[in-house]
C-alpha cells in the first residue's frame, strides 16, 4: 500500500468549482485559493439560512492510543460511503495545526483511500485561517501591554492579566516567560506565557460564532485581565474588537475542498479537544446541514472529551442535535487498553480484547446518556483476525445491544464503509431527540458541573479542586459567569487525569489544577492534572522526516 501522501498525489482532483456545483454554490460565491481550494463568501452562507437542515452525524471514538483509531479517516470514509449510497453528504472537519503536524500526531486529513485533498496544503498553511487567528490574538496581547504602558486608564492589574500569547507550534520553552525586559522603554516586566493557537479563546470564539456580528460581540466579551478593584477587563473595554474582526473577516468564510472520491468537505477552525472544545466551526456545520441531506462531522479524541463538549457546549449554544453517533474503535487499540504493548499488537489476543472492551463500553454508555442512537465502527487493520472481529461484534451485541460494523475504508475508500453508511441512515431516519440530554443543568454551580462530568462520564469518585482554582471559580460565580458550561482540559488517553491509567478506571479523583474564564466563547476551561495548553515536541519529532525532494515535492507528511 502506498503512503498517504503518495495516494493523495496520485489522485486526479476535480476543479473546486465542479465540487461547488454539486452543492448548488455558484462561481461568484467562491474565493479560490488555487484550483482545488476555495472559501465560500459570507453572503452565500447567509443565503443558506432559508434552506431546511439535513441530518447531523457525529463521529467520535474510544480513548486514543498510540495504536491509532482513525477517527478522521472514518469520518471521510463514511461521508464518501453515504454519497455512494445516494445520500448527498457534506463532510465537516477541523483544520490541522502545525504543531502536531511536525510533532508526534502528524496531520489531520484522513488516511489511505479516505483522505481530504490537497493533503499537503490542508496540513500546512491551507488558507491562512490559523495565521489570522494568531494575529488577532497577538493584537489583543499587544493592546493590553500598550494600554498599561500609556497610563493604564482602565486600572489593569499587571499581576492579573489572564491573556497569554499564542503560536501555532509545539514549543515547551514558551510555556512560562518573563516579558518586557531590557529597560523602561519596553514596558512593565511581568510573568507571561504562550499557548498553542488552537487553545486560544479567539479560536473558540471563531468556531462558535454564527456570523461576523456574533464574532465581534463574542470578542468583546472576552475577559483579558482584572482591574485593581478586581473587576473584569474585556476586549471591548480596550476597543480591540473592531480591528480583530477585520483580521478575521476573510478567515471566517468556510473552506471547501474534496475527498479522493470527490465528496465535498468543509474544513474550518480547529480547537483541540483535550485543551479546548474540539469541534469545527458552527458556520461550517450549519452550512453542511443546509447544503446536503447529511452532514458528517467529528469531535476530537474520545467521546469523554470531544463528544461531551460537542453536546454540552456546541449543541447547547446552537440548538444542533446529532441524528446518529458513530464511535470508532479498533481491535489494536482495545488490545492496548487490555494491557498489550504496542510491539505485540500483531498477534491474535481475544482475551486482551475482551479486557480492553471496558473502554468502548463506557464510551457507548456515555453517548447513550445523551439520548442519542449509536453505532460502533470497527476500523479494520491488516493484522486483525476474524476471531478478534467476531469477538468484538459479539461483545457489542451481547453486552451493549449495539451494532458493530467492520469498516475497510482505509484500504477501499467509501466502498469499504457502505455497511456503516446504511446503518447510520437507519439510525438517523429512525428518529432522534430534537435536543440531546445535557450532562448537567445550566443553573448548577460550576464546581457541581465539574463533579457531575467526572463522576458520570469519567467514573471518578470525586474531584479535588486546588485552592487557587477554587478561588477563581468563586470569583467567576460572583462576576455572573456561573451559568456557563465547563470545558474540561485533561489527558485524552484516560478517563482519569493519569494518561497511564487506561481501560475504564473507576474510583479515581480528578484533580483540578486551574480554571480559565472564556466569556467570549461562553465556557469555563477546567485544567485537570498535568495537561498543558502548550504541547512540547517528542524526542524524535515528525519534522525530521519531512523534506522537499529533487522535484520540489513535499515528502514525509502523514
From Swiss-Prot:
ATP binds at residues 65-72. PROSITE patterns: FTHFS_1 (PS00721), FTHFS_2 (PS00722). GO terms for molecular function: ATP binding; formate-tetrahydrofolate ligase activity. One of its GO terms (biological process) is tetrahydrofolate interconversion. Its EC number is 6.3.4.3. It catalyses: (6S)-5,6,7,8-tetrahydrofolate + formate + ATP = (6R)-10-formyltetrahydrofolate + ADP + phosphate. Pfam families: FTHFS (PF01268). InterPro entries: Formate_THF_ligase, Formate_THF_ligase_CS, P-loop_NTPase. SUPFAM superfamilies: P-loop containing nucleoside triphosphate hydrolases (SSF52540). Pathway: One-carbon metabolism; tetrahydrofolate interconversion. Keywords: ATP-binding, Ligase, Nucleotide-binding, One-carbon metabolism. Coiled coil: none annotated. Belongs to the formate--tetrahydrofolate ligase family. This is Formate--tetrahydrofolate ligase.
Amino acid at each position: 500500500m502506498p503512503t498517504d501522501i503518495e495516494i493523495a498525489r496520485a489522485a486526479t482532483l476535480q476543479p473546486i468549482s465542479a465540487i461547488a456545483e454539486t452543492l448548488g454554490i455558484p462561481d461568484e460565491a467562491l474565493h479560490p485559493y488555487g484550483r482545488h481550494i476555495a472559501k465560500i463568501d459570507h453572503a452565500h452562507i447567509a443565503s443558506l439560512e432559508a434552506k431546511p437542515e439535513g441530518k447531523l452525524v457525529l463521529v467520535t471514538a474510544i480513548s486514543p492510543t498510540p495504536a491509532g483509531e482513525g477517527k478522521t479517516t472514518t469520518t471521510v470514509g463514511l461521508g464518501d460511503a453515504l454519497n455512494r449510497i445516494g445520500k448527498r453528504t457534506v463532510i465537516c472537519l477541523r483544520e490541522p495545526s502545525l504543531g502536531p503536524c511536525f510533532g508526534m500526531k502528524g496531520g489531520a486529513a484522513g488516511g489511505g483511500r479516505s483522505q481530504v485533498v490537497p493533503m499537503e496544503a490542508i496540513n500546512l498553511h491551507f488558507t491562512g485561517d490559523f495565521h489570522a487567528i494568531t494575529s488577532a490574538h497577538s493584537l489583543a496581547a499587544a493592546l493590553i501591554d500598550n494600554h498599561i504602558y500609556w497610563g493604564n486608564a482602565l486600572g489593569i492589574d499587571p499581576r492579573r492579566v489572564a491573556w497569554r500569547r499564542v503560536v501555532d507550534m509545539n514549543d515547551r520553552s514558551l510555556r512560562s516567560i518573563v516579558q518586557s525586559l531590557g529597560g523602561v522603554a519596553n514596558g512593565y516586566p511581568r510573568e507571561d506565557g504562550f499557548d498553542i493557537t488552537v487553545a486560544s479563546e479567539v479560536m473558540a470564539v471563531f468556531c462558535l460564532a454564527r456570523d461576523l456580528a456574533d464574532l465581534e460581540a463574542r470578542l468583546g466579551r472576552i475577559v483579558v485581565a482584572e482591574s485593581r478593584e478586581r473587576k473584569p477587563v474585556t476586549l471591548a473595554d480596550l476597543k480591540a474588537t473592531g480591528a480583530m474582526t477585520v483580521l478575521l473577516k476573510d478567515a471566517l468564510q468556510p473552506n471547501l475542498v474534496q475527498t479522493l472520491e470527490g465528496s465535498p468537505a468543509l474544513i474550518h477552525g480547529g480547537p483541540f479537544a483535550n485543551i479546548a472544545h474540539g469541534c469545527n466551526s458552527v458556520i461550517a456545520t450549519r452550512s453542511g446541514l443546509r447544503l446536503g441531506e447529511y452532514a458528517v462531522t467529528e469531535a476530537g479524541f474520545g467521546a469523554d472529551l470531544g463528544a461531551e463538549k460537542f453536546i454540552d457546549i456546541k449543541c447547547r449554544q446552537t440548538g444542533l442535535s446529532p441524528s446518529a453517533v458513530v464511535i470508532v474503535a479498533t481491535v489494536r487499540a482495545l488490545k492496548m487498553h487490555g494491557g498489550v504493548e504496542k510491539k505485540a499488537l500483531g498477534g491474535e489476543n481475544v482475551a486482551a480484547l475482551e479486557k480492553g472492551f471496558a473502554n468502548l463500553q463506557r464510551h457507548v454508555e456515555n453517548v447513550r446518556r445523551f439520548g442519542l442512537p449509536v453505532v460502533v465502527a470497527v476500523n479494520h487493520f491488516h493484522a486483525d483476525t476474524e476471531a478478534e472481529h467476531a469477538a468484538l461484534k459479539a461483545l457489542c451485541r451481547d453486552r451493549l445491544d449495539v451494532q458493530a460494523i467492520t469498516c475497510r475504508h482505509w484500504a477501499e475508500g467509501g466502498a469499504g464503509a457502505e455497511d456503516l453508511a446504511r446503518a447510520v441512515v437507519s439510525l438517523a431516519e429512525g428518529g432522534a431527540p430534537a435536543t440531546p440530554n445535557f450532562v448537567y443543568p445550566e443553573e448548577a454551580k460550576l464546581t457541581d458541573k465539574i463533579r457531575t462530568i467526572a463522576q458520570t462520564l469519567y467514573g471518578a469518585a470525586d474531584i479535588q479542586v486546588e485552592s487557587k482554582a477554587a478561588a477563581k471559580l468563586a470569583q467567576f460565580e460572583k462576576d455572573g459567569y456561573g451559568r456557563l458550561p465547563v470545558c474540561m482540559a485533561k489527558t485524552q488517553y484516560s478517563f482519569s487525569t493519569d494518561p497511564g491509567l487506561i481501560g475504564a478506571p473507576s474510583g479515581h479523583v480528578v484533580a483540578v489544577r486551574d480554571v480559565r474564564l472564556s466569556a467570549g466563547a461562553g465556557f469555563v476551561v477546567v485544567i485537570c492534572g498535568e495537561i498543558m495548553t502548550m504541547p512540547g515536541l517528542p524526542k524524535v519529532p515528525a519534522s525530521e522526516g519531512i523534506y522537499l525532494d529533487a522535484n520540489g515535492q513535499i515528502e514525509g507528511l502523514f
